[in-house]
Regions:
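Short, small-residue-biased leader/transition segments that mark boundaries at the very start
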Residues: 2-7
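Short, hydrophobic transmembrane alpha-helix segments
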Residues: 8-18, 36-42
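Membrane-spanning helices that line or support transport/gating and their immediate boundary helices
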Residues: 15-18, 62, 66, 115-127, ...
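Structural signature of hydrophobic alpha-helical transmembrane segments
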Residues: 15-27
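Residue-level signature of catalytic and energy-coupling elements of molecular machines
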Residues: 19, 57, 120, 173
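Membrane-interfacial helix-loop-helix connectors in multipass membrane proteins
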Residues: 68-92, 197-221
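Non-transmembrane, extramembrane segments of multi-pass ion/lipid transporters
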Residues: 72-83, 130-174, 205-210
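Transmembrane alpha-helical segments and their cytosolic interface motifs
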Residues: 162-192
Length: 221
């Protein structure tokens, strides 16, 4: 739904800045809650929140791409101050070094973080499902031995089922995040190539100026 809303609507820079700030704040809150959670079931909504935040960020990517391609010829701040600030931090005073650093960060994000976390989620889900029959048998054995009552047995069964559902949801969410990372890389190339084409052919910019504007905006995005 957020993507469908983002396609026809062209966000002004100030609104895009506010939306990006909300997205960053929301992501930091999720990270802090996850770090300070002792039991996974205490934060069982994490896969759903991860999916929602990824969809929201993808919608913002679409909106920022539209703004970059349509207003990028106006300069570095054409897509708002948030994108410009991030680009300035990465690029510094040297666009070549900034571009190399940006490519390294993209590779680390996709190859190391995204693929690694996806593999971890997949293995965790597999081991949890494989261990499910053994845990059920252990609960039945404790119940038959009189170590626990029927109510405690039901609570334990409910807990292990919830854990299995959580890890299964995390496996699915990690695949969605991996797709989002691939989409982000494609959007990056679209911003650069499309920006150069729009800037040079439609807006009358020279190639070096167009490359400077649209490359910095893409890095910030």
């Amino acid at each position: 739904l957020s993507l469908h809303v983002a396609f026809p609507i062209s966000l002004p820079p100030i609104l895009l800045d506010m939306s990006l700030t909300m997205s960053i704040t929301f992501s930091l809150l999720i990270l802090l809650v996850a770090l300070y959670t002792n039991e996974i079931l205490d934060f069982s909504v994490f896969p759903s929140l991860l999916l929602i935040s990824t969809l929201f960020r993808l919608a913002l990517n679409v909106a920022s791409t539209r703004l970059i391609l349509s207003e990028g010829h106006n300069g570095h701040a054409a897509a708002g101050q948030v994108i410009n600030s991030f680009a300035s931090i990465v690029v510094g005073n040297n666009y070549a070094i900034g571009l190399v650093v940006f490519v390294i960060l993209v590779v680390i994000n996709f190859v190391v973080i995204t693929k690694g976390s996806g593999r971890i989620a997949e293995v965790a889900a597999r081991f949890t499902l494989d261990a499910l029959p053994g845990k059920q048998m252990s609960i039945d054995a404790d119940l038959n031995a009189g170590l626990i009552n029927e109510e405690q047995a039901r609570a334990r069964r409910k807990k292990i089922e919830a854990e299995a559902d959580f890890y299964g949801s995390m496996d699915g969410a990690s695949k969605f995040v991996r797709g989002d990372a691939i989409a982000g890389i494609l959007i990056m190339f679209i911003n650069v190539v499309g920006g150069l084409a729009v800037g040079v052919l439609q807006k009358g910019l020279d190639l070096s100026t167009a490359a400077e504007y649209y490359t910095q905006l893409t890095i910030g995005d």
